[in-house]
């Protein structure tokens, strides 16, 4: 659900920021292209078959004792089945993942710009370039670009705080 996603992204943001900081610092002003997250959605989900086995085991042990755990696993199984894709390499990934879950793109853009700002404040030139992967239509790019620009404005302010980005 969205609350769980946002909590996970809040944990991921500082790790991403730290990684980007190290890259920007090492590159000393050379443009750095960062491709936003684009793994297939199924890579983030538990395996359907494993969930089914876990549910069966919980039910055979003691269904009444494990009622809450069974309900939780069954809810997760339903979500996994809803998100199943015939060909995950072409489906819900790249910009389409960011369109469905804009908070993912926003978190990563914030991490990029926060890291860039930290490096710039140390007097080291920085030039982040944000790449939106697997764009199939101009509207997909426009939607993702708007999220990235919003994050840049939030982090860098109106003047860009001396960080030039693409």
Per-segment meaning from a language model:
Residues 1-166:
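Conserved alpha/beta-domain cores
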